[in-house]
Amino acid sequence: MSRCLACMLVALGLIAAGCGGDEGSAGEDADALLKRGFSTDVDSGRMSMDLELSVEGVEGADGPFRLELSGPFRSRGPTKMPDVDMDFTASGQGVNFEGRVVLLPENAWVEFGGDTYEVGQELWGRAQDSLNREGGPETFGDAGVNPLKWVTDAETGDTEEISGTETTEVTGELDVAAMLRDFNRLSPNSSALPRGTLDQIDDAVGPVEFKAWIGDDDIWRKLSSEATFTVPDDHRQGAGGLEGGKISLDMTLRAPNEPVSIESPGEGRPISDLLRALGVPPAALLGPGLAVPAPG
């Protein structure tokens, strides 16, 4: 169910990107609060993300898998990759590692296992150019997509202080079918999923709970989502016995629009060294035209 996980990640990411929404006739106060909370551009700050995944039916997958990311970010525009400096940790289900990812316009770096690896200026530039040439729409407006319309049955809840800011909670559900349709509209034609696949994902995913905390300055401070999924009987063998599971995702924004410092870690080993150490052929991840040859 990797697509289910990807949907949740992208859904919260797109909502967090900051886009306007229309007020509905039901739950008008909550809809208006969401619209205000995501209409303000957030160009910099500190972000933390906590992803937890529990699965059933997979031998050896005891307990949840957890991925945490945190660090500063800085926008370079709606169609460009942001500058980031994120620490990450992963634990559970036989996994335990930590590291750091730094993305800047001129290069990208990964710190892992005590070493620093760099993508390289030429390779990173080509990778960014490739992303910009994929053929998908450049902005939500170009695609006619408003992520706030994925939120249904919105209601306001309690107030809570988050990072020194008074916030109001808004709860609702995400419309999975509408979200999947819009994903296809945002994707390049070559990456669009067929209708049958969209229907399978929609059928497999249970209700997706959504929560947002909007600050009294009309900037969102926290997003949370949780969902269960069930793998159809005839797909379980091909999924390694996976029967279903539960996914939760929390994102917290701190110091919105405050200045941040993101600097290069310096020279590092080729990223292909790390990929090979992890058993990943460089061409599989970077593409045949972007793979870095082995030294010697």
Which residues does each predicted region cover?
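Sec-dependent bacterial lipoprotein signal peptides
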Residues: M1-A17
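Subset-of-secretome marker
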Residues: C19-G296
